[in-house]
Amino acid sequence: MLTNEQAKENLKKYGPNELEEGKKKSVFQIFLEQFKDFLVIILIISAVISGFLGDVESAIVIFVVITMNAILGTVQTVKAEQSLNSLKQLSAPDAKVVRDGQLMQVPAIEVTVGDEVIVEAGDLIPADGKLLTVASLKVDESALTGESLPVEKSLDEVPEGAALGDQTNRVFSGSFVTYGRASYEVTEVGMSTEVGKIAGLLKNASEKQTPLQKNLDDFGKKLSITILVFCGILFAISVIRGESIVNAFLFAVALAVAAIPEALSSIVTIVLSFGTQKMAKEHAIIRKLQAVEGLGSVSIICSDKTGTLTQNKMTVENYYVNGESVCSGEIDLKDPAQRELLMFSMLCNDSTNQNGQEIGDPTETALINLGSLLGEDYAQVREEYPRLSEVPFDSDRKLMSTEHFIDGRYVMVVKGAVDVLLERMSHIQDGDTLRKITEEDRVRIEVQNKHFSENGLRVLAFAFKTMEQEQGLTLNDENDLTFLGLISMMDPPRVESKDAVAECIKAGIKPIMITGDHKVTAAAIAKRIGILENMSEACEGAVIEDMTDEELQEFVPNISVYARVSPEHKIRIVRAWQERGNIVAMTGDGVNDAPALKQADIGVAMGITGSEVAKDAAAMVLTDDNFATIVKAVENGRNIYQNIKNAIQFLLSGNFAAILAVLYASLASLPVPFAPVHLLFINLLTDSLPAIALGLEPHNPEVMKEKPRAMGESILTKPFLTSIGVEGLCIGIMTMTAFMIGYRDGNAVLASTMAFGTLCSSRLVHGFNCKANKPIIFTKRFWNNIYLIGAFVLGCLLITGVLMIPALQGMFKVQTLTVAQLMTVYGLALLNLPVIQLLKWIRTRKK
């Protein structure tokens, strides 16, 4: 016990009782990171060269686009962190300590080494320590060990080096008192606690780039090299044709600006940003922007059991009474034996429900919750039949007894382990009568108990004994008992878990359960929700302890359930799947999940029950702690990736058309079809709006019928490049057709005007072609994107304004078109739609 002064000194010496956070990046650092993209670097170089050579307009436009993109990325990153911070709260906001001989409440962060802390049912343990006094203390350490059932604590010494879950004379930060009360002396705080040690493991787990980051980096380098080659060819052709070196270089740079989709980075960021906002509304907060797509790419989900796949709440499954097993949903309170078993289970019970908060051992709260579901108020039952005396539960005899006055007689109610109670039975309740218990009765009870246990159920036996008079119960009274029945219970799966697992399997994702709980219990849950088919797919962590990394890589495909695992096991399992070429997601809520969350490609933490360490390690936080939210996130991720691909296809096919048109004009010794201002107009207006709209395409549930993309698969696949080439060729042909029509009389300005109008209009129309890889012109899906329709209408108005308004004609170096010429421009642009839709139909038929 400390004095206040000693507590202050120790607080200075050992530091505050909190976990250290990694060094936070400043907003300016986050802003600078937005400029690391290879495409952005190329554009900056182009802008500098353009400005140096006099094309200040192009340089300004490029810098504005890049800066806007960087600001948007910074805002989204900061917003995501702020959303997560709103979830954060201290593991134990306050703690009761004894200082200067007085009990006082202090912030958990001020608890220090040497403090005497008082805890009781409902309290969180604020720091690690050794027990001083104990009164039937049980502690839920599931967040630390993965064990779903509370651990009974005592003052008995334990062997040095005992496993964490076996240190029954100590309590650990972040644990939860479910029953009893105790006092303990604090021995470790902050990063020195067991929670802190696990947090330290995170430093050894490297962070991974998401698939989108890898693909876009690869894509940007290949695209830039290709475009620079094209620009070099154009520069050489221009010089050979007699153009001055300066003019040839300026146009090559202008073409580079037009060909490199500088809007790409900002469009990808905008699409991901909208994706994160949509997912936040669906209870998923994204901490790392590109994780939106990354989650949709996973092929393995390693999930914790307790609180993630299950409810983290014990519920009654079955009654065994009068020789029959009855499901909890079929309990009939008109049956005297069933009603008596329910009543006795609420009387021989210390748990309570205070303002909706369950206080007590989970197995006991499950019993009073069942009573509530059946219309029986435990408080009224206890008031009607008050407890006269008791023999509290202890782990040695594994029994609890209470005495009550019921219907004119004194009754002792006993509950406990089946094997212990059977030894003390002399009679059995058989319908309305009592009779002596037979060996056959005992065998039936043992068989039923074994059946329940093999299905992962926790079993309690109940018995009673009529007393001659009120007396203080003693241990000697717990004999000559009458067997009443068994009650089985378990931490059941979440309602949504089975469907969520089935959806994952349909999508080609293998769900794996990794837990610190017992193998039988874990396997029972896994079978219920579809993760496990037979017991050969389940193993305990000890099995992989001595395996080499290579042996583990060969072993993991055969296992769907891992039980009794340590944090180090989890990291090894995740890494083994990654070494096999899989993209791995790890879901969980406990401190023990955090290292694997960090090691995984995508870490998914629980927002309500999740520990602070787990949230900090994760890429995504589920605010509803619902496993089914992950399935929606997978669908969102896949759709967002597809939408980004559609936007890229739209941008590159249009850019390819412009390149083909310019190259054709150069090779055919024709005038240059576009002025630099034309290309800037196309990039900023007729490209960006439809591309963003394509990124916001309504989600297509069909993506969940596809298998995950192969790890390392580039965006620039052969079919993707072929589509870009063919579609770009079609648009290029229409553009140069318009150019040649306008150039019949040798009017280069008219030819350039018609080519510019056709290219702009064609790209607007082409947005509808890029909605899907198959023809959709005659389906509802063709019209389901209001953003794309809006971009098309706005783009048409802008083009028409440039072509028809005299003040804009001079600025954009175009001339007035006749009605016939205008119809020719729009007609050629619209022709792209049926032509490309027909090509998609032919390609689909071939598949």
Region spans (language model):
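Generic alpha-helical transmembrane segments
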Residues: T686, I731, T753-G767
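C-terminal catalytic subdomain
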Residues: M734
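A C-terminal functional module that forms or caps the active site or interfaces directly
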Residues: C770
